[in-house]
């Protein structure tokens, strides 16, 4: 592993420092105020940020800031294609088990006191070996350790030389490149992790378009432009364009909205019941009063919202539950109007899930191949009769557990199901408690979301593979079907994309037919920016990409 910087990089830094000395300025002193004319992108994170260590970047709250600071071997473009990042190219062996990555030689870690002279060094293949082994180390306790479960660690990962990395798999996995786009797979310097220890997440050192500047917890987090960032635009200009990123931590959503309207925030993400009708028309268009001031971005989001049934009859609590009856589960699927729900509760942001579990935006999504459920109260009543509950007589009340964010959706479903003879009780739980109860099979009927970890249908269909039962895996319904498992395993070993998509669609249809879930809607990314913000755009993973963003006017909020 080499720790020396290139002459070109050293000289580029030496000249500005010399100029500052000539001007009589303290080169090492941080100015109290930023230079005039700085462009700062400002957004709010209402849930707070616990760490900036990519090893723990599990939620969108953490992924967004981590994405500005770190890079991996590969990255995803806005069309979900895997593109080079630190790796400039790669090869995959014929058997699909050996990946060889050829790295750029112009990628440097951010300047930090952990390096000799405080100057960031060049990234090597050995840094990726260290970063991957750190994620796999049980002592790290990274929630992303599962990514590398299929690695043949007897052979690698292996740094062949400074710019060549080999990764060996136990068995082929066609979605592996997509996995490597996850922020868990970011490269980190051993020196910084060892120097800061458990505090590395509060003193991050990465390679990204921005570097860490300052963090006042609960108040403000500042990133500054990485002037040595390796990526350039189509015209050869070095990215990023912005000078800084400022993240605030306003917890109240209405206050956040007001700050955005006043121009103190550049970006607002998602819908809040408190302001959706102010920003959007019922049809999902921008409120005309904001025309010329605010831009609305929407596109399919790889997120399926659903209700899940615990169908594992080996569990005593499930054995006497009416949801073990497939006809009851299907009646629930037919018993409410998804289209009406989306219009009145989501302002048509999102698409009614009238097909399978796979969302719009994935290649395997096929409304022509996978038939789902549409509102049909007569069919729901018929299924109840066939299940032995005519008009719902004798059917015990079913408890649906959710968090408060989805109370309105669940109450809508509750009301409509009552009209076909199905009585639903709604139980509201807090986020952490709710997730724990779902993972540990304590809820018979629950609301769920599945946001893609990586853009491959396998990531969704793994939720119904019998070897993935929670709490060890993501199969929260404990659905089990030998035929489904066989299709899933065949898909994992199929390199041909067209054949694999066909297998995925067969599995998706099986889930609809067996009904361990109630698909609600396929979500949409919804973003609001002021018109002076350019090039933000959106993507199906709802990743916040700021390296291309430009602002027309200037800010001074980057201290």
List where the protein language model places each region.
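A structural "hinge/loop" feature
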Residues: 47-63, 86-87, 113-119, 175-185, ...
């Amino acid at each position: 592993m080499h720790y020396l910087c290139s002459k070109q990089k050293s000289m580029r830094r030496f000249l500005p420092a010399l100029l500052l000395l000539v001007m009589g300025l303290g080169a090492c002193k941080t100015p109290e105020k930023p230079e005039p004319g700085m462009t700062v992108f400002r957004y709010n994170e209402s849930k707070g940020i616990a760490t900036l260590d990519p090893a723990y970047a599990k939620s969108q709250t953490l992924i967004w800031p981590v994405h500005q600071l770190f890079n991996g071997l590969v990255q995803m473009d806005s069309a979900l294609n895997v593109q080079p990042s630190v790796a400039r190219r790669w090869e995959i062996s014929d058997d699909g088990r050996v990946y060889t990555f050829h790295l750029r030689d112009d990628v440097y870690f951010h300047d930090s006191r952990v390096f000799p002279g405080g100057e960031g060094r060049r990234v090597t293949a050995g840094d990726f070996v260290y970063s991957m082994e750190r994620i796999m180390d049980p002592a790290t306790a990274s929630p992303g350790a599962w990514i590398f479960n299929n690695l043949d660690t007897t052979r690698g990962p292996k740094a062949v030389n400074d710019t060549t990395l080999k990764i060996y798999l136990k068995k082929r996995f066609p979605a592996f490149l997509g996995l490597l786009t996850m922020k868990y797979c970011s490269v980190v310097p051993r020196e910084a992790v060892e120097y800061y220890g458990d505090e590395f997440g509060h003193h991050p050192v990465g390679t990204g378009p921005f570097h860490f500047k300052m963090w006042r917890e609960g108040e403000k987090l500042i990133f500054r432009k990485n002037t040595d960032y390796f990526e350039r635009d189509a015209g050869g200009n070095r990215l990023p364009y912005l000078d800084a990123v400022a993240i605030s931590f306003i917890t109240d959503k209405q206050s956040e909205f007001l700050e955005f309207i006043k121009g103190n925030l550049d970006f607002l993400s998602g819908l809040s019941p408190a302001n959706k009708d102010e920003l959007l028309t019922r049809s999902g268009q921008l409120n005309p009063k904001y025309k010329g001031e605010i831009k609305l971005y929407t596109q399919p989001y790889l997120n399926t919202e659903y209700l899940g049934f615990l169908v594992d009859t080996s569990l005593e609590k499930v054995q006497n539950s009416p949801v073990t009856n497939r006809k009851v589960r299907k009646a629930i699927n037919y018993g409410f109007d998804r289209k009406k729900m989306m219009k009145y509760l989501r302002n048509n942001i999102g698409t009614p899930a009238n097909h399978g579990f796979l969302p719009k935006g994935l290649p395997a999504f096929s409304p022509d191949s996978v038939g789902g459920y549409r509102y049909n109260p007569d069919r729901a009543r018929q299924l109840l009769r066939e299940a032995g509950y005519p008009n719902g007589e004798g059917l015990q009340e079913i408890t649906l557990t959710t968090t408060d964010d989805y109370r309105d959706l669940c109450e809508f479903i509750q009301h409509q199901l009552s009209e076909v003879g199905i009585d639903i009780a709604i139980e509201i739980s807090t986020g952490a408690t709710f997730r724990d109860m779902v993972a540990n099979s304590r809820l018979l009927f629950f609301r769920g979301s599945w946001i893609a970890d990586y853009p491959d249908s396998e990531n969704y269909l793994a939720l119904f593979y019998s070897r993935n039962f929670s709490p060890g895996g993501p199969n929260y319904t404990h659905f089990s079907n030998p035929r489904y498992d066989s299709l899933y395993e065949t898909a994992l070993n199929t390199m041909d994309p067209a054949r694999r998509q066909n297998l995925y669609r067969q599995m998706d249809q099986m889930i609809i037919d067996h009904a361990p879930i109630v698909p609600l809607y396929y979500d949409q990314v919804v973003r609001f920016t002021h018109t002076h913000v350019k090039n933000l755009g959106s993507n199906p993973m709802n990743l916040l990409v700021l390296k291309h963003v430009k602002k027309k006017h200037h800010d001074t909020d980057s201290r």
